[in-house]
Amino acid sequence: MAQVSMRDMLQAGVHFGHQTRYWNPKMKPFIFGPRNGVHIINLEKTVPMFNEALVELTRIASNNGRILFVGTKRAASEVVKAAALDCQQYYVNHRWLGGMLTNWKTVRQSIKRLKDLETQSQDGTFDKLTKKEALVRTREMEKLELSLGGIKDMGGLPDAIFVIGADHEHIAIKEANNLGIPVFAIVDTNSSPDGVDFVIPGNDDASRAIQLYLSAATTAVKEGRNQETVTEEVFAAAE
């Protein structure tokens, strides 16, 4: 079972919040106190809250649920992509486009365009175009890949979103709320926990902390997917 210990979190610097002057009072229940002008997060709260979130992630994955990892901050971007690919899930790591969830119909059309361009680039269509037209299409494809590459095979809305940095990704959280999609989020001391179903109070800037969250989340998802596979095999054997 995916679990994270107090020691893991201390070593990764999960407890270091933001400077006290930037705090959000809604995070008061999760703050241990100030130290040298920085708020220290109470890991006695974070550890059980995160482990509870991991149990739920495993459950969602075991029901063949789609999990969308969201992290567009520079410190999170590449790690979010790697984590999602590692557990065969989906990601947005460049920029959240408004309506990515709430206007899925339009997003689906853009994904279709991206896949059409990918096919054209591989089947020789680009070679028949003028250099200028081929360049225009290549640039369009690269731009779409940057924005939608992580969700092009999602096939529909996700069953949950896992967010690194609630303040930075507030639009994604709001869209998920509007659609009733459960939100798991790392919430730092300068952020609001509003709209987050599974609040994980913690540092959302330190790369070691981000790696810890994502490593545990991917393990939880993989465990859930393995349960799903085992269940399918049991049913197949019974038939």
UniProtKB/Swiss-Prot annotation:
GO cellular component: cytosolic small ribosomal subunit
Keyword annotations of the record: Ribonucleoprotein, Ribosomal protein
Gene Ontology MF terms in the entry: structural constituent of ribosome
Domain of life: Bacteria
Tagged with keyword Signal: no
GO BP annotations, alphabetical order: translation
InterPro entries xref list: Ribosomal_uS2, Ribosomal_uS2_bac/mit/plastid, Ribosomal_uS2_CS, Ribosomal_uS2_flav_dom_sf
Record family assignment: Belongs to the universal ribosomal protein uS2 family.
Protein name according to UniProt: Small ribosomal subunit protein uS2
Lineage, broadest ranks: Bacteria, Pseudomonadati, Pseudomonadota, Gammaproteobacteria, Pasteurellales
